[in-house]
Amino acid sequence: MAGHSKWKNIQRRKNAQDAKRGKLFMKLAKEIYVAAKTGGGDPASNPALRLVIEKAKAANMPNENIERAIKKATGTQEHTNYEEVRYEGYGPGGVAVMVVCLTDNKNRTASNVRVAFSKNGGNLGETGCVSYLFDRKGLLVIAREGLDIDEDDMLLQAIEAGAEEMETTEDSFEIYTTPEAFEEVKEQLEKNGFTFASAEITMIPQTYTTLAGDDLKKMLKLIDTLEDDDDVQEVYHNLDESVLEE
């Protein structure tokens, strides 16, 4: 993980999504709906719902949109049955790609994902072909701006809260947890007075692939095409995006 700021990748993804705010709100509403339908509409007793509500608020999603999605999931009207489906494959230059979808029509989604890969120099693979290249982790990002704490003290508080490790960048402290400990670590750090620029359970690449030229352009187009699809919730990849800062 050293030398590759996951938070930088998240910022780039959020900036891209901000330009497509309506589509982002629709995807967040779907995620809220599924979380509420699965675990109930009370965020206090449903950690998954609580987390996605926080994510929605961070994206400036209106409260009425959030409440509407919860009411739709917990009401008596006919429900939409969304199923989580994951696709794995390779982008240009052998970049590993995982695509997480929520869909009510697997045939439509599979076709769209397959076309996105084939049109942008990639290949859709079998389940498990790249997932072993990622680790599922909780990631809590604390912005350093205006924060009066040094790296050693921050690390001590993170470890005492139950975190696995912490990385320090120029802009942030990036705290990693197991998925199981994520909620507990988050709550403890909140009790300690910290707020988060980002808080999510995500897939962290074990290694990164560097691209340039046409391969890089095609890979970025593949990511954009997948993220534009209404059924796609997340696109994880191991492209070294630090080159985009140069």
Swiss-Prot record:
Belongs to the TACO1 family. Its main location: cytoplasm. InterPro entries: Integrase-like_N (IPR017856), TACO1_YebC-like_2nd/3rd_dom (IPR048300), TACO1_YebC_N (IPR049083), Transcrip_reg_TACO1-like (IPR002876), Transcrip_reg_TACO1-like_dom3 (IPR026564), YebC-like (IPR029072). GO terms for biological process: regulation of DNA-templated transcription. It comes from Geobacillus sp. (strain WCH70). HAMAP family: Transcrip_reg_TACO1. GO terms for molecular function: DNA binding. It holds the Pfam family TACO1_YebC_N. Keywords: Cytoplasm, DNA-binding, Transcription, Transcription regulation. This is Probable transcriptional regulatory protein GWCH70_2524. One of its GO terms (cellular component) is cytosol. It is found in: Cytoplasm.
